[in-house]
């Protein structure tokens, strides 16, 4: 069994900087040689183009390896500790993702269509007795078009969502099935029949609420809950989508445009990174804490 390397903060920070710098260099080389390969083939300089093509693959491989090494360092030395501080029974897979079926089952009301799912940083655990799953998610749509020049059909992939996705199982039937979406004119036109106007102008301005029954939306989204969601959305760093499913699950998706546990352009400071990751995790746990206190969340048992 592979042992995790124990590193001091100074050593870890140096290793993180090294892999990030190397990854950046190889990414630039990959793009440059890739462009050069295209131009050389266009100029019919085939022998040279073949050489640059091989180098493009070599540089791309090195870029990928440094990216994987960076992710593993973060996961082993910072992310795992932050997750264990927040959740219990943690299972963390840096290169795993939420099952596509789970995402589809949410029935999230998006202003776009998607045909594929991928992601990373899959987390599974429990939070105060609730079963939780969380991961980076990327949704993309593949469309086909005919290339007149090559006289072939080509697939074109477009990213429509990139961000974080939480699934929390409350273990009880909820009092309704309600979806919240970032407000968009196109969505309002599509959902004239099942949209619900709430008694909060600011909330209506930010979210489109859809439900089979307006009463269920009013029951779940109390005035206090709407104020909390508005406040949380203001700190989310992207569009917020939510799905309260009658079976007991809550889905929260935030379109941040980035991965969760990443170094990015941040300074490679271990303590700051740890606090950053904890802060992002607490954004999600704050929503769960707030909902657990809501008397109107669960379906009331009726006597026989």
Regions found by a protein language model. Name each.
Residues 26, 33, 52, 56-59:
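Generic L/I/V-rich hydrophobic alpha-helical segments across diverse proteins
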């Amino acid at each position: 069994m592979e042992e995790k390397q124990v590193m001091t903060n100074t050593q870890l920070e140096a290793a993180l900087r090294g892999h990030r710098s190397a990854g950046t260099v190889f990414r630039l080389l990959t793009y440059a040689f890739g462009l050069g390969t295209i131009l050389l083939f266009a100029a019919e300089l085939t022998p040279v183009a073949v050489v640059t093509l091989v180098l493009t693959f070599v540089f791309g491989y090195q870029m990928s390896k440094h990216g994987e090494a960076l992710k593993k360092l973060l996961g082993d030395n910072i992310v795992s500790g932050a997750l264990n501080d927040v959740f219990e029974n943690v299972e963390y897979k840096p290169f795993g993702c939420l099952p596509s079926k789970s995402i589809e089952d949410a029935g999230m009301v998006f202003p776009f269509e998607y045909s594929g799912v991928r992601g990373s940083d899959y987390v599974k655990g429990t939070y105060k007795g609730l079963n939780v799953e969380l991961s980076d998610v990327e949704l993309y749509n593949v469309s086909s078009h005919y290339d007149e020049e090559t006289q072939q059909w080509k697939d074109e992939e477009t990213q429509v969502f990139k961000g974080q996705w939480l699934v929390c199982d409350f273990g009880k039937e909820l009092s309704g099935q309600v979806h919240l979406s970032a407000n968009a004119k196109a969505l309002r036109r599509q959902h004239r029949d099942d949209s619900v106007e709430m008694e909060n102008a600011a909330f209506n301005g930010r979210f489109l609420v859809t439900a089979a029954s307006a009463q269920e939306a009013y029951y779940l989204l109390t005035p206090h809950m709407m104020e909390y969601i508005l406040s949380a959305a203001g700190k989310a760093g992207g569009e917020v989508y939510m799905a309260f499913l009658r079976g007991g699950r809550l889905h929260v998706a935030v379109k941040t445009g980035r991965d969760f546990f990443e170094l990015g352009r941040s300074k490679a400071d271990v303590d700051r990174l740890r606090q950053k990751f904890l802060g992002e995790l607490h954004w999600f746990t704050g929503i769960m804490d707030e909902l657990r206190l809501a008397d109107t969340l669960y379906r009331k048992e009726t006597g026989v």
